[in-house]
Amino acid sequence: METKEKNTATPYDLDGKPPLKLAIPLGLQHVLAMFVGNLTPLLIITGVCGIESGSELQVALLQNAMLIAGIVTLIQIYTIGPVGGKLPIVMGTSSGFIGVCRSVAVTMGSGVAGYGAILAASFIGGLFETVLGGFLKPLRKFFPAVVTGTVVLSIGLSLISVGIGSFGGGSTAPDYGSLENLFVGTVVLVVIIALKHGTKGFTSFSSILLGIIVGYVLVTVMAMVLPTTFTYVDETGATIEATKSWVINWSKVADASWFAIPKIMPVKWVFDAKAIVPICIMFVVTAVETVGDISGITEGGLGREATDKELSGGVMCDGRGSSLAAVFGVLPNTSFSQNVGLVAMNKVVNRYSIGIGGIFLIACGLFPKLAALISIMPQSVLGGAAVMMFSSIVISGIQLITKWPLSPRNVTIVSVALGVGYGLGSNSAVLAQLPESINLIFGGSGIVPAALFAIILNIILPKDEKTEVEMAEEILAEKKKMESK
């Protein structure tokens, strides 16, 4: 009888096993929603660290990123001891770390050693977040929606400039900002918007992936009809001939093997306090973000608040997963807000269905040709998708902030935290006279100061006379009163 109940479960049941004909497409739907976002941070940071596009190392890292996302997703869904929230949450490489990782890479010399420092710091930071997750219950009161929303919003704002940089072909490319790069990025962005809002079902929730495929086709056709090289004068006055940044090198896909066992420790770790301190602070920030995502899943998909056990297990999974990711040369893992939004939209909360998506990600991590195909993506194609992805993070933050009425207290928290955070992120030169350690922590992306100010202001500002719930109830009552008239 129990088996029958499990087999007749629906996608809207948290537990049980729906028929595979339903579970497989629903699981793949979640993979498609996060596939590009899972690999984008790695493409950006490896570029900053001077790891060649399409190189054997970058392909191995992308391969591992897919593998780790699948493994950590399964841990989050089914748990190992206290680790995991036992909720339908998809895990993947965190975009929130892009800013601080870029700062660390530049400080360490923008080479492979910089990437090694990021990995060592991520391993330690993951252990730190795991411990933080174990003590989350007494700390939960410090992370209301106004704080988590401000953090998510600051992450989105800090990433938009990164997306625009890729949109133009990559800020280090000799042909950065060329009409061809801007044309490619614009086409990809327009296709994504058209598919997302002009279609339904598969094409709508896969709009980013399909937009990138269109970008690949577009640059391939452009390479057939337009010149693929150009000349420019470098800083020394020499005339250089170079390949345009939007041209794809298909030979790297042809050279990649069909199957390979993922490599452990593909990059040598470098332990340096200049990397460890800011990245550990960023793990506090991402813990706040994960609390918001878990709350979004339970409230949007299950119609209830998250329990302390779910929040604690979810944050601990973030930490353990990030430490595991570092062992495989991958950037920190966290819950994916895109998938939280998908669950809230379609109410599909079945863990078995989403677990199938995790298994698919693990399978993808075993095929280097797929990783090679992604590694040769032109920056302008990536930028067209990144602008959309990073902007959606901004909207997620706004939705969290406006979850309850914006009281004067909450307005102060949001405005001061964003003002200081975004201001320092966009004009870090104001900290030039301070010690390097302060610059590295607070001048990288603005996320850390925004998070710290939001948390501190939430603690020290007098509480509102009316609670958020009471204010919301008053507004609902007023609306009903107006409707009755």
What would you call each of these model-derived segments?
Residues M1-P88, G96-M108:
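N-terminal signal-anchor module of multipass membrane proteins
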Residues E2-N7, N38-L42, T46, V187-G198, ...:
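Juxtamembrane interface elements at the cytosolic ends of transmembrane helices
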Residues N38-L39, G215-T220, M224, T231-S322, ...:
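Membrane-embedded hairpin module used as a gating/binding unit in multi-pass transport
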Residues L28-F35, F123, V147, S178-L182, ...:
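Hydrophobic alpha-helical transmembrane segments of multi-pass membrane proteins
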Residues V106-V225, G357-M471:
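Membrane-embedded alpha-helical modules
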Residues L20, T46-K86, V277-R351, L476:
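Membrane-embedded helical hairpins/re-entrant loop segments and their flanking transmembrane helices
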Residues M1-P25, T228-I264, E299, R304, ...:
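Intrinsically disordered, low-complexity non-transmembrane regions of multi-pass membrane transporters
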Residues L61, P82-F97, K141-T150, S204-L210, ...:
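Short, non-helical or kinked segments that cap or interrupt transmembrane helices
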